Each structure stands twice: as structure tokens, then as C-alpha cells.
């Protein structure tokens, strides 16, 4: 099984990236959030990988963060949620936010995500509440202070520039660790560089 890929980004598409590892291009399905956090083609990158083996195919699903991979693995354990559906869900909501919504039983928040109806949201809460509690605790209460403000401003700026919500959320999440103490214009320049890559 393939658990990690490190190489150069050869291509970025709507729902996948091609990672060139030693001259071999691996097609890796990724969420919009992970896709937005990947560097431009030609740049080095590493992805955590889930290998899905079917009778007629072998599919790779990639994740920019450990949290996203953990939530993906939990989602595919839920009856009726396969790898593609899990990836689509994670394109609409950040992994820790999903974990918090599940832990709080927030069905209304979950149903705002494309691909999650009321019955699926209720099933997620019932089946995943215990599995995602540690991740929800790690997410803690809402992000504090200036970091939250500048990331919210960054998302708003990207949306105003015409980027889709998953793209804005993905790049903001990718910049979270380096956001503290940085001005919005600097973060926006870095976000645009990543998105245009």
C-alpha cells in the first residue's frame, strides 16, 4: 500500500493532482482544500495517501494534513460513504470543523456541506461522534484573536476576487500556521501565488 508520496507537482486539476515521483506520475484524488494548499506545478510537495483497492482499479486519495486523512478514514467507515463522497465532503468543510460539528451534534452545520443531506448528517453524528472527539478537542473553541481575524479577512478577500469557497478555505488553512503576526496584504500575496500556481 502507498501511504505517502513525495515528489513534484506535475499537474493540478479540479479534483486531483498528478505527482511526479522519480519520473512516474501518480494521479492522486484530493479535496479542494488540499488542492488549494499544494504548491504550483514544478514545485516539490508531499502528500499523505490512502490507497483504495477495488476489483478493477487502484485509486490514490491524498491529504495535505494528518487531520484531513484521519477524518477521511473515519468517513469511509460510515455506511453509504465511499472514498469519492468522503473527498467531496472534505472539499466543503475543513477536517477539524467537521469533527467539531459531529462532536456537537450540529446537524444543521453538516447539512450546509454539499453532498450531506439530513439523514447522512444524522448518521455521521451517530457513527463518528466517539471517533472524532479527540480531533474536535484539539480544534478547541473557535480560533482566538488576531489569527482568526486575519484568516477570516483573507478568506473574504479571496472570495471577493472570485475564488470559490473551498479554494479560499483551503489556502487559508494552509497558511494558518504562519498567519500569526503577519499582515493581511502579505498573506494575500502568498495565497494568490499558491492559487495561481
From Swiss-Prot:
**Which parts of this chain are annotated as the region Flexible linker?**
141-145
**A GO-annotated cellular component:** Holliday junction resolvase complex
Q: Where is this region: Domain I?
A: 1-64
Annotated source species? Anaeromyxobacter dehalogenans (strain 2CP-C)
Q: Where in the cell is it found?
A: Cytoplasm
What free text does the record give on domains? Answer: Has three domains with a flexible linker between the domains II and III and assumes an 'L' shape. Domain III is highly mobile and contacts RuvB.
State the encoding gene.
Answer: ruvA
Q: Name one Pfam family in it.
A: HHH_5
Kindly list the biological process annotations in GO that this record carries. Answer: DNA recombination; DNA repair
Family membership noted in the UniProt record: Belongs to the RuvA family.
**Disulfide bonds listed in the record:** none
This chain belongs to which protein, by name?
Answer: Holliday junction branch migration complex subunit RuvA
Claim: Cytoplasm is one of the keywords in the record = yes
**Is DNA repair there in the keyword field?**
yes
Q: What does this protein do?
A: The RuvA-RuvB-RuvC complex processes Holliday junction (HJ) DNA during genetic recombination and DNA repair, while the RuvA-RuvB complex plays an important role in the rescue of blocked DNA replication forks via replication fork reversal (RFR). RuvA specifically binds to HJ cruciform DNA, conferring on it an open structure. The RuvB hexamer acts as an ATP-dependent pump, pulling dsDNA into and through the RuvAB complex. HJ branch migration allows RuvC to scan DNA until it finds its consensus sequence, where it cleaves and resolves the cruciform DNA.
| Keywords from the named record | Cytoplasm, DNA damage, DNA recombination, DNA repair, DNA-binding
What is the protein's quaternary organization? Homotetramer. Forms an RuvA(8)-RuvB(12)-Holliday junction (HJ) complex. HJ DNA is sandwiched between 2 RuvA tetramers; dsDNA enters through RuvA and exits via RuvB. An RuvB hexamer assembles on each DNA strand where it exits the tetramer. Each RuvB hexamer is contacted by two RuvA subunits (via domain III) on 2 adjacent RuvB subunits; this complex drives branch migration. In the full resolvosome a probable DNA-RuvA(4)-RuvB(12)-RuvC(2) complex forms which resolves the HJ.
- InterPro entries in UniProt: DNA_helicase_Holl-junc_RuvA_I, Hlx-hairpin-Hlx_DNA-bd_motif, NA-bd_OB-fold, RuvA, RuvA_2-like, RuvA_C, RuvA_C_sf
Give me the ranges of the annotated region Domain III. Answer: 146-197
| Region annotation Domain II: where it falls in the sequence | 65-141
Q: For this protein, what is any one GO molecular function term?
A: ATP binding
